[in-house]
């Protein structure tokens, strides 16, 4: 557990979950995918 910063990477879902100061950010780091919305 990092103080004030926790980075959890979900490889199975090809998604990066960033927890910063109780803030939730979802980043899709899957390059070359046709899942662009």
From Swiss-Prot:
Q: Where in the cell is it found?
A: Cytoplasm, Cytosol
Q: In which tissues is it expressed?
A: Expressed in seeds (at protein level).
The molecular function terms of the Gene Ontology recorded here are: nutrient reservoir activity; thiamine binding
Task: Name where the Hemopexin repeats lie.
Answer: 6-37
GO cellular component terms listed in the entry, alphabetical order: cytosol
Query: Any idea which UniProt keywords this protein has?
Result: Cytoplasm, Seed storage protein, Storage protein
Coarse class of the primary localization is cytoplasm
Task: Give the miscellaneous note.
Answer: On the 2D-gel the determined pI of this protein is: 5.7, its MW is: 26 kDa.
Quote the subunit structure annotation. Answer: Dimer.
Q: What does this protein do?
A: Binds hemin and thiamine.
The protein in question is named Albumin-2
- From what organism does this protein derive? Lens culinaris
Q: What is the lineage of its organism?
A: Eukaryota, Viridiplantae, Streptophyta, Embryophyta, Tracheophyta
């Amino acid at each position: 557990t990092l103080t004030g910063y926790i980075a959890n990477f979900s490889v199975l879902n090809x998604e990066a979950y960033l927890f910063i100061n109780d803030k939730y950010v979802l980043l899709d780091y899957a390059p070359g995918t046709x899942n662009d919305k």
